[in-house]
Amino acid sequence: MCIRDRVKEKSDWDTNASTVHKGVAAYFCHSTYVAVVMEVILKKNQPKLKKVWCAVDCGIVINKEGATNMIEGRIIDGIGHAMYSELKFENGSSVHKNFDTYDFIRHRQSPSEIEVFFVENEITPTGLGEPALPPAVGALANALYKATGSRLYHQPFSKHHEISLV
């Protein structure tokens, strides 16, 4: 079973609920496969992240707790980059001189739960630092499309599409 099928199974993808919207995306880099499903609900017509499922095939996992923490962090970073982060430049240098002018995701905007599971195999360990961020962006965009009916092509979504997480 491929990781995309596994994450869809774990997230109960085929269950249809009119108030719950799910998006899926998969990615491969550094010899690691990652698939993400995000679950979004609308609260006063604004999206709220409920739960994220993530399947990872990165070979032998030496430190499962540390690996899970890395994946969770990259998912939250991916959500933050997709929704809020934008580097602005003027005359060849960054407008942002400190973090007070650069938007980050807030704790209240993070998913209520992230479930990470690893494919168990005997393959040599591979990369784990980057692979979960890109599919988090894609899964979020797909879930927001299902929730709002609008495709999101430009980041940050909050600026270009006037969507903000509650």
Map each language-model feature to its residues.
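Cofactor-binding beta-sheet edge motifs in enzyme active sites
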Residues: 4-166
